[in-house]
Amino acid sequence: HTNDRRQRQMCIRDRQHRLDGLNLKTALFTNLTRDHLDYHKTFKDYLNSKLILFNKLLLNKGNIIFENGISQEKELNNISKKKKLKTYKIGNENSFINLKKIQKINDKKRIHFSLLKKDYSFNSYLIGSIQIKNLLFAVLAAYLSGVKIDTILRNISKVKPVNGRLEQIGKLKNKSRVILDYAHTPDALKTVISNIKEDYPLS
C-alpha cells in the first residue's frame, strides 16, 4: 500500500481483482499448483484466471518472466508472441538468469547466479530453494525495471521472509528450529516439507 504519488516503480503480488484497471510493464509467472481449486473448481479455470494477468493487464511489448520448462510454457509463449512481449526465462545455462550454486554457511546461504552470462552472488537467510528462486525472479524484475545490479545486490540480502512463509520463529535449547508456514493443502505441505529438508536434512 502506498499514497506516494512520486512512486515510479512498484512490485505487488497478484491477487484476485486486486489488479483491475492497472497497466503492467513486467509480469512474472512463478508457479501453478492445486491450492485454490475450492475457488476455481478446475485446474484449467485456475490457469485461465492467472493468464488474465498476461493477456489483459500486461502492456504490449512488456516483459514476461517465467521458469524454463514449466508445463504452462506453451501458453505463455503464445501470449508473448501475440502481444510482442519480451520473454525472459529463469532456469538453465541458456536462460537470461540462472542459479548456479547455493553455498550453505551455518544459517546463512551464499547464492551464486549468472545474469547475462556474468556471475554474481549475494547472501540470504531465507529457508528453502523455492524462496531462493523467488529472489532470482525479484532480481530479474528489478533489473528489467532499470535498477542497477549493484543496487539490487546491496538490497536483496536484506529481504526477510513473509510472515508465515517458511519463517523461523524460534530455536530450542537442543538446537531444533521452530518454522512457521501456513501451508494447508497437500501440494503446499509437500513443498514446505521438502524445502525444510533441503536446508535441515535431519528434520
Predicted features along the sequence, with ranges:
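Single conserved hydrophobic/aromatic residue that forms the stacking wall/gate
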Residues: 1-12
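Conserved helix/coil segment N-terminal to the catalytic DExD/H
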Residues: 13-20
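Short, conserved loop/helix-junction motifs that constitute active-site signature segments
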Residues: 20-23, 53-61, 80-83, 199-201
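Flexible beta-alpha connector loops of hexameric P-loop NTPases
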Residues: 35-40
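Nucleotide phosphate-binding/pyrophosphate-handling subdomain across enzymes
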Residues: 105, 115-203
